[in-house]
């Protein structure tokens, strides 16, 4: 992995994301029709335009609360959880992730942390569900695809408005179902990128 220590949501960070499959967008690969995502990435690659998604009130809440949630996570787990700006895959520079945190041991990342700060209703649903919510599965699994050394990813939901404010669910790389899923993802990622390159070549003919 290649770590770029840039501030998330800065101009430099947005520029690094251009034409790159990141954690927040990786789910588009698995849609029944992923062609719009193909064109989105090609447009970014060819134009260099930074298209910032509208920031909703819920997103602003999450951005503001994330540092508080990470501090709570550190206190609860005693983990050496470090904020990282942007991480690029060693072999494929079109794959990257902006982790909420990586957990280090002896100077090596051994785990990832994906934080959500949802509404109380959603937080309670996540606690009762006892697993990674379906809408965040691709994002969580993307950590394993980018950072080879991590052995687990903690999905964290944080809501300081209730007594059970922190929910942590750990996904292990060596879980047989996870290992099988990761093999499938490798094929799908490469298949998608081959498709994108074919579309781009046709456009540039």
Question: What do the predicted segments below correspond to?
Answer:
Residues 1, 28-29, 68-72, 153-159:
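Intrinsically disordered, low-complexity boundary segments flanking structured domains
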Residues 195-205:
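Short, flexible loop/turn segments with low-complexity composition
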């Amino acid at each position: 992995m290649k770590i770029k220590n840039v501030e998330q949501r800065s101009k430099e960070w947005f520029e690094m994301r251009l034409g790159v499959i990141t954690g927040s967008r990786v789910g588009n690969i698995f849609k029944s029709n992923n062609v719009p995502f193909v064109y989105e990435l090609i447009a970014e690659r060819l134009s260099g335009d930074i298209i910032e998604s509208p920031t909703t009130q819920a997103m602003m809440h999450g951005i503001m609360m994330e540092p508080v949630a990470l501090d709570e996570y550190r206190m609860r787990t005693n983990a050496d959880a470090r904020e990282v700006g942007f991480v690029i895959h060693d072999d494929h520079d079109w794959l990257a992730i902006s982790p909420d945190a990586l957990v280090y041991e002896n100077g090596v990342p051994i785990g990832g942390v994906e934080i959500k700060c949802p509404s109380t209703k959603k937080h309670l649903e996540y606690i009762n569900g006892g697993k990674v919510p379906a809408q965040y599965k691709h994002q969580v699994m993307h950590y394993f695809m980018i950072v080879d050394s991590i052995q687990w990813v903690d999905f964290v939901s944080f809501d300081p408005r209730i007594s059970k404010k922190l929910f942590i669910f750990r996904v292990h790389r060596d879980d047989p179902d996870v290992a099988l899923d990761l093999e499938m993802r490798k094929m799908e990622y490469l298949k998608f990128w081959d498709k994108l390159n074919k579309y781009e070549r046709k456009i540039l003919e």
